[in-house]
Amino acid sequence: MNYGNNGGGQWQPRGNNNWRPQGRGRGGGGWKGNDNRGGYRGGSSNDGGWSNFRDDGNLNFASPYQANRGNFRGNYRGGGGGGGGNQNNYGNRGRGRGGFDRGRGGGGGGNKNFGPIDANKCIIPSMWNNPWDALEKEYEQEYGVAITEKVTDPSPSPSSAEETTA
């Protein structure tokens, strides 16, 4: 995986931005959808606007254009994962609240790292194991079915045991 700002995933062609107008206010510009590159930010980094790094459930990385102006809140990495969780760690700069999480689904949220970013603190080994674990548990509670045993139970299930011995 790519934990840096050097390129990231090239899922969208870099061209005209047809989703948001350029301008001040809530960041302006920005990318819509899955864009992990972290290299583009609409508006100005000093006007208190919101940067628009948000995508549904993918890890985001802080923009190099959003300088740490003596305040690292909102510029941390980590968390993410989880189906449908919108993680916006870069908003509300200059509005007295710092950054915030709005993670929903499995994962979401993340490591609040109020200092220089240390990637070692941001990688959660159990998350890579099964990032959908919390989502699966929610589904089980809501629908009363068991879907996680195939992931959490290390012993083979009866059906797979039959296949191997047949």
UniProtKB/Swiss-Prot annotation:
Biased composition (Gly residues): 1-10, 76-86
Top-level taxon of the source organism: Eukaryota
Region annotation (Disordered) ranges: 1-117
This protein's name: Uncharacterized protein B0285.3
